[in-house]
């Protein structure tokens, strides 16, 4: 029988020693958000600064401040190359810095739907080394991926090398593949620091109106998916009088956890994973992370399961709620591109748009405020300025602060007229002119 404590001690090294396993010219990936390992990333940044590593490609999703303050700094961009599947403020800042400093492109965007991330990383890209923050080892020799199942639990096992950072603040989360044995790990570092937390954003009046409209579209017994931010929190608050809701979501947020604690979410009407709130990654604050710890009502699963439209559709009355940046007069949505640059990503939006509509009684909801930049720019546009994230043929419900519309079954003329009604009044007349020029009305 393996002595797990001896194995742990043998593999426990300093961060500087651990990152020597990461070689020049290799492909590295890491955990998302709170699962980014700060000690390892800091040691890796120091190696790059000393010129000890070159041409390292880092493939990531939902980059957080830990990576932004260490390996993803402009001065290291000659040595460490960023390949992002989901653009955040970290990448946007680097994009601006690259343009302003040298005109050089230093952020590479990898288009994908989130449910494909595991296959892309394992088969198409090929990850050499994977790094992740984990909870401490139990007496049986298992550590836990905590807040990040997503692609992590799969890639940790397909990468050539696995380095973990043990942190007592990382919760132990029940889930598929969430526990990993000491025998599967190449190196361990210890670093007990509080996990990074999701910032609390201030709501605006338009979001309050949108949240009320969306809540009215959610029936009792619905199975929910939504994202992260001020609007999802408002929507959750507006759902507190609902009954028997379920959770099958890409992102677990504080609002959903609050509904679970209040008994609004029971998961008893789900066809699959009944009784459990299923998610693929969690982002919140310390109290939420503490509530997740060893809580059997939560179950994390890999993203190729959670975001698979065929899996999503197995539950009835799925309601997916996602945001967009632009909606055109045909119903197509651009949720990722702004002012000529990649601003966000496709993420799991299309996964859940398709899965929700395929669900019996399900509906997908795409939402946006009607304007941006202090009401000077309309988010309802004649034609999209960027790529299509959700095609017009997939768009179901659209919601702005001015109302909602179900586009399914409407002609192109009916769509254009109804979408214009959701635009800010200051832009409706011009949109009607544009619609006529496009022969939509």
Segments from the language model and where they lie:
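Conserved alpha/beta enzyme-core scaffold
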Residues: 1-441
């Amino acid at each position: 029988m393996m002595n797990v404590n001896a194995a742990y001690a043998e593999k426990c090294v300093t961060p500087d020693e651990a990152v020597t396993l990461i070689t020049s010219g290799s492909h590295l990936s890491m955990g998302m958000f709170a699962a980014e390992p700060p000690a390892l990333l800091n040691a890796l940044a120091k190696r790059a600064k000393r010129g000890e590593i070159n041409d390292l490609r880092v493939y990531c999703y939902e980059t957080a401040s830990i990576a932004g303050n260490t390996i993803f700094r402009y001065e290291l961009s000659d040595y460490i190359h960023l390949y992002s599947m989901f653009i955040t403020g970290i990448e946007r800042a680097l994009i601006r810095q690259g343009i302003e400093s040298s005109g050089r492109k230093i952020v590479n965007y990898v288009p994908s739907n989130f449910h494909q991330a595991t296959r892309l990383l394992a088969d198409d890209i090929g990850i050499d080394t994977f790094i992740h923050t984990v909870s401490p080892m139990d007496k049986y020799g298992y550590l836990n991926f905590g807040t990040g199942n997503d692609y992590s639990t799969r890639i940790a096992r397909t990468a050539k090398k696995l380095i973990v950072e043990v942190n007592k603040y990382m919760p132990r989360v029940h889930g598929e593949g969430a526990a990993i044995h000491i025998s599967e790990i190449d190196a361990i570092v210890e670093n007990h620091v509080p996990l990074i937390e999701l910032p609390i954003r201030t709501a605006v009046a338009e979001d309050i109106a949108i949240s009320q409209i969306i809540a009215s579209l959610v029936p009792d017994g619905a199975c929910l998916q939504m994202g992260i931010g001020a609007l999802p929190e408002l929507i959750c608050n507006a759902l507190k009088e609902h009954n028997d809701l379920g959770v099958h979501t890409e992102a677990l947020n504080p609002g959903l956890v609050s509904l679970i604690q209040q008994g609004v979410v029971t998961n008893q009407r789900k066809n699959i994973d009944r009784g459990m709130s299923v998610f693929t990654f969690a982002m919140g604050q310390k109290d939420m992370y503490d509530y997740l710890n060893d809580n059997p009502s939560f179950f994390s699963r890999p993203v190729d399961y959670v975001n698979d439209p065929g899996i999503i559709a197995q539950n009835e009355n799925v309601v997916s709620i996602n945001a967009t940046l632009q909606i055109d007069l045909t119903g197509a949505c651009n949720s990722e591109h702004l002012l000529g640059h990649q601003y966000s990503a496709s993420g799991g939006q299309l996964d859940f748009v398709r899965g929700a509509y395929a669900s019996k009684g399900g509906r997908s909801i795409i939402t946006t405020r009607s304007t941006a930049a202090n009401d000077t720019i309309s988010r309802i546009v004649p034609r999209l300025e960027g790529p299509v994230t959700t095609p017009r043929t997939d768009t179901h419900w659209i919601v702005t602060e001015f109302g909602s519309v179900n586009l399914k079954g409407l002609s192109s003329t009916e769509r254009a007229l109804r979408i214009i009604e959701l635009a800010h009044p200051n832009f409706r007349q011009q949109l009607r002119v544009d619609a006529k020029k496009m022969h939509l009305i």
